[in-house]
């Protein structure tokens, strides 16, 4: 089941198609290549709203070959990982470059995982997380600023290891609040976008 798509800014005309079951396929302009760009089926949990859920290409993908994926891991946790495309074959990712940037516990429910990854006009990586599932957010995650569920998060993936928190994030430096938070009180931000005019 296709759930997301990304177009590289490298002049190739390709499209990357994200399948919830764990593969990313390459459309080369005329057909879908037989060999997946990436296969993470052994790393993810599937069923209900779980799986491989989103992909974002680094703004400099054409030169650094870097991209990011969002998925539910084998324990049902939310995970964001960084990869690079192979130097030898641009249509295949190099699995050896995988680095998990962030894992967010998501206990008890298989729904409300959020899912979208996208780079903003500021060059930072944004992603939405679901509230953890269950009717009415029974754990109160979305309003709890000490957990990352039910939020819009913003991180700087170009500095630090594995990332840094932008100093302009609203909760930075506040006790009991996670600095990655950009917005909170969200139920299940499955998809979002940036205004092309105002950002």
What are these regions (language model features)?
Residues 107-109, 168-181:
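Short, well-ordered junction/capping motifs at the entry into regular secondary structure
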Residues 80-88, 140-158:
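Beta-propeller blade signature
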Residues 177-199:
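Repeat-solenoid scaffold signature
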Residues 32, 89-94, 162-174:
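Blade/loop signatures of beta-propeller domains
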Residues 132-138, 173-177, 188:
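Flexible glycine/proline-enriched surface loops and loop-helix/loop-strand junctions
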Residues 1-136, 191-194, 198-199:
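Acidic, Gly/Ser/Thr-rich repeat motifs that build Ca2+-stabilized beta-propeller blades
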Residues 20, 122-123, 130-131, 148-149, ...:
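A fold-level detector for beta-propeller and closely related beta-sheet-rich head/sensor domains
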Residues 135-147, 163-167:
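Acidic/polar, solvent-exposed loop segments in beta-strand-rich repeat domains
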């Amino acid at each position: 089941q296709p759930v997301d798509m990304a177009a590289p800014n490298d002049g190739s005309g390709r499209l990357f198609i994200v399948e919830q079951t764990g593969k990313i396929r390459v459309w080369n302009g005329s057909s879908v290549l037989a060999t997946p760009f990436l296969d993470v089926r052994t790393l993810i949990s599937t069923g209900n709203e779980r799986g491989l859920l989103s992909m974002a290409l680094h703004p400099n993908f054409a030169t650094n070959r870097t991209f990011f994926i969002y998925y539910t891991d084998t324990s049902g946790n939310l995970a964001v990982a960084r990869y690079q495309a192979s130097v030898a074959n641009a249509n295949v990712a190099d699995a050896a470059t995988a680095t998990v940037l962030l894992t967010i516990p998501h206990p008890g429910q298989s729904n409300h995982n959020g899912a979208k990854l996208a780079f903003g006009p500021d060059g930072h990586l944004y992603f939405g997380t679901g509230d953890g599932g269950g009717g009415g957010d029974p754990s109160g995650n979305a309003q709890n600023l000490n957990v990352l569920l039910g939020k819009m998060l913003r991180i700087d993936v170009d500095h630090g290891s594995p990332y840094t928190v932008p100093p302009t994030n609203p909760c930075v430096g506040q006790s009991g609040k996670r600095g990655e938070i950009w917005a909170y009180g969200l139920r299940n931000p499955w998809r979002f976008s940036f205004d092309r005019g105002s950002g």
